Amino acid sequence: MSCKKWCSSSQAKWILAGSVTVTLVLAISLILGLTLHQGTQPGCENDAICGPDADMLDYLMGMGQISHRDGLLVTWYHAANSKKEMAAALNSDVMVLEADVTVEGFNTANETKVPIMAHPPAIYSDNTLQEWLEAVLASSQKGIKLDFKSLKAVGPSLDLLRQLTEAGRIRRPVWINADILRGPNVPISIEINATQFLTLVQEKYPKATISPGFTTLYVPQLPNSTYTQAMVETMQELVGALPQKVTFPVRAVMTRAAWPHFSWLLSQSERYSLTLWQGASDPVSVEDLLFIRDNSAAHQIYYDLFEPVLSQFKQLALNTTRKRTYYTGGSLIPLLQQPKGDGLEVEWLVLEVNGSGRRAAITVPDREGMILLDIGLQEPEAGNPVPILHTPGGPALTLESCLLRLAVHPRRWGIHVNIVEPEALRPSLATLAHLSTLGHLPWPVWVGSTVSHGSFVVPGHIAGRELLTAVAEVFPHVTVAPGWPEEMLDSGYQEQMVTDMLELCQGLRQPVSFQLQAGPLSQSPANTVARLLASSPRATVTVYHSTAGNSHVDLWAGLWAARAVDRTRVYYRISQEYWKDLQADVSSNRPSSRIGPSSVEGFPGESR
């Protein structure tokens, strides 16, 4: 009996011990499995998109996190500094982690060289950069953006990043950020030394995206205070020659007011993008964000914004049917031409005008493109001269009335104001400035004319300097479109004529589209178009045709000569018949041997 009890008791103990053992094994296996799972996240295998210097959008697309290259699709986690915040960030579905780096005990007797994760005024943290990187690399595939708050932290941090990269552990984009220039409303110098910061990056960790910013302070009492032209130009001088991708962090609440400067900056290199960020109390306007998006390519702008602004903006931005507003001084991309698309996508259009004065009616084109307006001057019996559409012997319609009528139409156009009477230049610019102020000029605008300058001085044409001076003084937010007098083109565009035009336009802030006649271009030095395009990243060439004195063979030769140099930055101001024929030849991938289109109609801006 006692043996039976002992055996029963012993059996129960073994069963209990076995159960506990099995439970422990299962628990350990589960923990180990989770740990191994975290440490063996599906990695990035394509070297082209997996390095620390990879494009963020290409990486996120490759990892299946976004569907296409659009900065609006990228999500961010702010200040993932402490271990608690870091854990929350890692457990979230955000795509990029943003964290701040300084050195332990910064500017105190206890200062060390250890990089820690903290945002000023904090100078201590429960998380070092090494611990932060170990956790992020082991348990996620999120992109990394490190914001450096002291120069002392940069060198040791870059050394650590280099070691991890050389060990093959950093297989994702890394952005290196620091505020290196004084920006709006900041009275004292608190920025990180630009030269030292950029030098450290080049020496220690050049394979990264650089994110150089401005110190800023938003002051509600100064809502119009923003980035200046000088600030933006200084930034370009600092980073223009660097080999890395560069994304400029700019304060969203101040960006639209400075858009002429940032539009210029983005055009300086395909390596550039902007990252719009929002201060916690900044009253960012959704309308301003939409304007910025409408005037840039989707891959050029990232949006690091708070709710509810982000959701409100995203809902409207992704609505393909909403009406867009374009910057008058902006590119035809993406309005009429896809990024890196063919300039032949853009068609030049004309208006039909019936009647005159207030009774005049216009028939707008049934398709999108650049609307060419030849502008002369009407001298009223009293008052100021009025710019009008120039239709010799035809009806009169004022430039203002024409543009107001176009503004109500939903189609997307650009406007090419071609000044055919020199006296109409400043009144036309004044009209454009007035309508722009009222919000009635929602498209890119070109202002151009035949100019007289240097080796191509011809009486009766606008002086080249006067064109540029008038634009700068009256309405600078346009693309300038100068051309050469036809009287000087019997031998084509000679080298000195091109040199003088380039000298005239040197240093212009505005985009320039040089107007070249196709016939004379065929008789010009082979490098004519290339020289003009090389003058500026914003320079384009527009080839147009004249029915006077040029054979159709020369005309087609000129069109193809320009096209052979560049497809993206060459436009074609030609009649619809020529435009269709050129498209057909391009589609068949062969230069044309045409002697002319099947029917040739007059086209405004042509010589006859």
Curated annotation (Swiss-Prot):
Keywords: Membrane, Transmembrane, Transmembrane helix. Residues 586-608 are annotated as: Disordered. One of its GO terms (cellular component) is membrane. Residues 586-596 have a biased composition (Polar residues). It is a single-pass membrane protein. The chain crosses the membrane at residues 14-34. Pfam families: Menorin (PF10223). It is found in: Membrane. Its main location: membrane. Belongs to the menorin family. This is Protein FAM151A. It comes from Mus musculus. The lineage of its organism: Eukaryota, Metazoa, Chordata, Craniata, Vertebrata.
